[in-house]
């Protein structure tokens, strides 16, 4: 019986990564019909679909598992083949990692910079909410993920990184305009806030747990950029919860003030990655864990 042909999965990976059959064909230097035929052969072999044919195409649950397998095999090939062939001209290894926006805006890039300088690696850092990134590792879409989840998924491990402390801040003018009578459920209901996106539960938790304010009762901007949070707060447009690590200078200079001293939202974060790692991925995991445990509150 014929086994699984990795050219079939290569075609699936190209379609998903490139976003269309046409671009996948260009990427692999084959015809579009060849791409379509390989995916049909894969689906026939498995007796189930691997691709949701919409725009852009998306993998089915079994397709995601195959992509995870394929990317792990590719990573192992990249580490082993140059040694076997004594070849130093191998293309950089491509690695996809899932991170939350606040880690990317504060400590993650300094943690990775030495590996990026010394190893041939192309990183794709994709931002997801802290509770969603682990799903990308489960599906095989990424090789590692920063998550709030402490429990490791099968065949992976979870290393504790540290704590991210969030403070609720605004500029002095904004504070006087909206909170001159104090920060309470009445004044919070009138003051515009900003959060990352509809999946951002941090601000909702802050309002309900500390002030018994329904999140849907406040003016709430969504901006998918941690850096824009800071700009909006500095401009006096909104108040926000933001990592203390990101605004150390602004708090010291007084351009931002902690409007709820005594209330601190903290999350423990973890690095989830494959148990059996080699080469550059192992170095990346070590760099992330070592840097975070040195620089984040523990």
Swiss-Prot record:
Residues 21-40 bind DNA. Residues 4-60 form the HTH lysR-type domain. GO terms for molecular function: DNA binding; DNA-binding transcription factor activity. Keywords: DNA-binding, Transcription, Transcription regulation. The keyword Transcription applies. The keyword Transcription applies. Belongs to the LysR transcriptional regulatory family. PANTHER family: HTH-TYPE TRANSCRIPTIONAL REGULATOR ARGP, TRANSCRIPTIONAL REGULATOR. Homodimer. Controls the transcription of genes involved in arginine and lysine metabolism. This is HTH-type transcriptional regulator ArgP.
């Amino acid at each position: 019986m014929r086994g699984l042909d990795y050219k079939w999965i290569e075609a699936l990976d190209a379609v998903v990564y490139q976003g269309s059959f046409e671009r996948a064909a260009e990427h692999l230097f084959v015809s579009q019909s060849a791409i379509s035929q390989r995916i049909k052969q894969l689906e026939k072999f498995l007796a189930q679909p691997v691709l949701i044919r919409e725009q852009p195409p998306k993998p089915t649950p079994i397709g995601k598992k195959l992509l995870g397998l394929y990317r792990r095999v590719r990573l192992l090939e990249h580490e082993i083949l140059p040694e076997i062939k004594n070849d130093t001209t191998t293309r950089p290894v491509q690695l996809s990692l899932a991170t939350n926006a606040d880690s990317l805006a504060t400590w993650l890039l300094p943690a990775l910079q030495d590996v990026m300088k010394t190893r041939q690696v192309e990183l794709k850092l994709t931002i997801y909410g802290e509770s969603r990134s682990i799903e990308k590792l489960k599906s095989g879409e990424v090789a590692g993920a920063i998550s709030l989840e402490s429990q490791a998924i099968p065949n992976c491990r979870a290393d504790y990184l540290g704590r991210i402390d969030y403070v609720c801040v605004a500029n002095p003018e904004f504070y006087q305009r909206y909170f001159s009578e104090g920060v309470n459920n009445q004044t919070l209901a009138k003051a515009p806030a900003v959060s990352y996106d509809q999946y951002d539960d941090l601000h909702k938790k802050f309002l309900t747990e500390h002030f018994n304010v329904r999140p849907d009762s406040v003016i709430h901007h969504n901006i998918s950029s941690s850096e824009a949070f800071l700009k909006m707060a500095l401009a006096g447009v909104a108040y926000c919860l933001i990592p203390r690590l990101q605004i150390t200078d602004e708090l010291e200079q007084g351009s931002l003030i902690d409007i709820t001293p005594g209330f601190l939202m903290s999350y423990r974060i973890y690095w989830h990655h494959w148990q059996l790692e080699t080469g550059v991925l192992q170095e990346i995991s070590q760099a992330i864990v070592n840097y975070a445990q040195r620089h984040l509150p523990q």
